[in-house]
C-alpha cells in the first residue's frame, strides 16, 4: 500500500502592460527603450537573487526592502502582476507571518522568470 505522488506543475504566465512600454518607447526611442528595459531586467534579476538569499537567511528586514524595490522597478516596464505579488510579499514580511511569506515568495519566484522573459521578448519584437 504505497502512497501515490502527484507532481503539480505550478506555472504562472506573466501579464505585461504593453502601454507602459509604449510610453517608454515614445519618450525614449526604440534603442534607448530597449537599453532601459534590459537594464531594469538586469536589476530585477539581481534583486530576485538577493531576495532569495535574504529569505534563506531569515533576514526579513532586507527581504522586505528588496520586495518593495522589485515592485517599483517592475512597474516601470509594465509588469503589474509581478509588482503586485512583490508588494504582497513585502506586506507578509512586515506582518511577520512565515506561512504566507513562504507561499508568496514561491509565487514571486515562479512569476519572475516568465515575467522577465516576457518583457524582454516584447521589447525585442516591438522594436522590429
What are these regions (language model features)?
Residues 1-65, 69-76, 80-128:
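Two-component system phosphorelay core
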Amino acid at each position: 500500500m504505497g502512497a501515490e505522488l502527484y507532481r503539480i506543475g505550478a506555472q504562472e504566465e506573466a501579464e505585461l502592460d504593453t502601454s507602459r512600454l509604449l510610453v517608454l518607447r515614445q519618450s525614449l526611442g526604440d534603442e534607448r527603450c530597449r537599453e532601459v528595459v534590459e537594464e531594469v531586467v538586469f536589476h530585477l534579476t539581481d534583486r530576485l537573487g538577493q531576495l532569495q538569499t535574504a529569505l534563506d537567511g531569515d533576514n526579513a528586514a532586507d527581504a522586505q526592502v528588496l520586495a518593495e524595490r522589485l515592485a517599483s522597478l517592475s512597474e516601470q516596464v509594465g509588469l503589474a502582476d509581478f509588482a503586485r505579488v512583490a508588494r504582497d510579499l513585502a506586506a507578509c514580511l512586515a506582518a511577520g507571518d512565515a506561512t504566507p511569506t513562504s507561499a508568496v515568495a514561491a509565487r514571486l519566484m515562479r512569476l519572475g522568470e516568465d515575467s522577465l522573459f516576457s518583457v524582454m521578448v516584447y521589447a525585442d519584437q516591438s522594436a522590429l
